[in-house]
Amino acid sequence: ISDNYLRFYLNYIAPNKEKIEKGRFEGKSLTSMPGWEGIMGLQFKNLVLNNRNKVIELLQVNPNDVIYDNPFFQNKTIRQEGCQIDYMIQTRFDTIYVCEVKFSKQPIKISVVSEMREKIQRLKVPRHISRRPVLIHVNGIVESVLDSEYFSHIIDFSQLL
């Protein structure tokens, strides 16, 4: 489902419809509801994917050079480990942009670097392919993420909203 409101309704409102109608959520903040951050994370990833042309532009990639851009899932087998890439862009010039899309109420912590290193290590691609890590976030990052100089690009999505 690509419509953000419909996705939110099906995942959050519909399962709680009876409680909502009985007034059990009156006076409660949405952000305090169970699973709220997970739902918002999915919504944010969907928002990023719906604005993929802007992401490609910010990465300074010519849209005509893109041969693949979508989320990517690599199944675990005997020879390879599994991994899930939030958003991956492959160009005809043997470059893959491995994008980690992070939503958090707090600034993104330095642990994102080790998480990304592990994903890229697990990703099976030919040796000649360049893998460029990209962080797409909202609500900031801690200074140590910048200091690590790990990511080829860091996109603060709140600047686009």
Each model region followed by its residue ranges:
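A cross-kingdom feature that marks ATP-driven nucleic-acid transaction machinery
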Residues: S2-L161
